[in-house]
Amino acid sequence: MAAQAAPELAKLDLNKNTGSVEANAVSAGGSEKEEAENEGDSDDDRDDEQAGGSAEVNAEKKKKKKRPKKKKKTAKVQSSPPRIPLTTLFPNSNFPEGEIVEYLNENSYRTTNEEKRHLDRMNNDFLTEYRQAAEIHRQVRQYAQKELIKPGATLTDIAEGIEDGVRHLTGHMGLEEGDSLVAGMGFPTGLNINHCAAHYSPNAGNKVVLQHGDVMKVDFGVHINGRIVDSAFTVAFDPVFDPLLTAVKEATNTGIKEAGIDVRMSDIGAAIQETMESYELELNGTSYPIKAIRNLNGHTIGQYEIHGGVNGKSVPIVKGGDQTKMEEGETYAIETFGSTGKGYVRDDMETSHYAKVPNAPSVPLRLSSAKNLYSLINKNFGTLPFCRRYLDRLGQEKYLLGLNNLVSSGLVDAYPPLCDVKGSYTAQFEHTILLRPNVKEVISRGDDY
């Protein structure tokens, strides 16, 4: 908000000055007879009266008090830890837009096409919800980078610190039935260390502590009315890992640059792989080529469906394969993963991530615990992914038998951690982009990445 200029100081009353001068003139004038008789004294009288007039003006100056200066209004800033709802900081819902990128090559006409600009202006609600979610993601991750993600911190403290920030900034704490469906976490916070690339979040009782030599991927989502912003970054404290992080960050930026309406997925994957695999990492005297993890992909994002639902599309990060094209109006998570290992991940470690299967067929459930849990999942998460800590937070106890029954019945999908070979290091960077009619908007772009 622009600061209000301080009001001007009160001006002198010129009328009173003028009145004093006129009074002096009358006193000095008098009758001609008196002037003739007292000619010698009249000059002194005029001097005295002029002095009196000056004293009167000075007295008036002293009587007029200066108005107190109004305090300048300062723009509200986010607290630390983040607790101020974003709508308080942006009361008019004029949230910052993401990075605007013009379409390349044959799609460049869209940038200037009047009809496309008109269609784009019609999507204000859609854009407002995405931009709100993106700004929350930026503010929370910047706090996490400065205050939470440090050697010696537990993964549980980091995850809960991020999630508490998101809930406060959306204004929805998710403790009342259905509240998490209005706004909140788009999916659980992934904190994936070293050879683990994705889908690891601490369960209750987790004691893992972040170490100085770790490479950790931080992946979390924010949603407003089901509009999910999916963005991730990698943290390494030892600069020896900088080439790995740079390779993956540049590969993601290449994917964003190549993405666009009518662009083939295979072309994007080829460009990503070429960029990433031009780097190598030297560790303890050994050079490791950085490989794109070939069985991990970017993806479309649907409303309340992180992977786009049954008609979702995948964005490969290696060459070959899918000839499907991107289309106008779609939302994509452009994410790339690099590894010093085999460049291929498998299920490993304890599962934390789950999600209800969209449009799952009706299945009879024999376990009452499974029935009750499925009802709770429907009412609180819908098709949004959740983790076991979220069930703990809602007061659920001894639910693992029912949860496993829902998975085996095909009503809920389990997403175990995805890992390359032990001893390897993996990195990830990810942004959400909107293929608007006239431009693509990198909605989650920030100053950090």
Curated annotation (Swiss-Prot):
Record region (Disordered): 1-91
Region forming the signal peptide: none
Pfam families according to UniProt: Peptidase_M24
GO terms classed as biological process: proteolysis
Residues binding a divalent metal cation 1, per UniProt: D219, D230, E430
E.C. number(s) listed in UniProt: 3.4.11.18
Amino-acid positions noted as binding substrate in the UniProt annotation, renumbered to this chain: H199, H307
Segments of skewed composition (Acidic residues): 34-50
Chain sites annotated for binding a divalent metal cation 2: D230, H299, E335, E430
Keyword Flavoprotein: no
Keywords: Aminopeptidase, Cytoplasm, Hydrolase, Metal-binding, Protease
UniProt main location, coarse: cytoplasm
Keyword flag Transit peptide: no
Cofactors, names only: Co(2+); Zn(2+); Mn(2+); Fe(2+)
Cell compartment(s), UniProt: Cytoplasm
Free-text cofactor note: Binds 2 divalent metal cations per subunit. Has a high-affinity and a low affinity metal-binding site. The true nature of the physiological cofactor is under debate. The enzyme is active with cobalt, zinc, manganese or divalent iron ions. Most likely, methionine aminopeptidases function as mononuclear Fe(2+)-metalloproteases under physiological conditions, and the catalytically relevant metal-binding site has been assigned to the histidine-containing high-affinity site.
Biological role stated in the UniProt entry: Cotranslationally removes the N-terminal methionine from nascent proteins. The N-terminal methionine is often cleaved when the second residue in the primary sequence is small and uncharged (Met-Ala-, Cys, Gly, Pro, Ser, Thr, or Val).
NCBIfam families: met_pdase_II
Family designation: Belongs to the peptidase M24A family. Methionine aminopeptidase eukaryotic type 2 subfamily.
Entry-linked PANTHER family: METHIONINE AMINOPEPTIDASE 2
The name this protein goes by in its record: Methionine aminopeptidase 2
Provenance organism: Arthroderma benhamiae (strain ATCC MYA-4681 / CBS 112371)
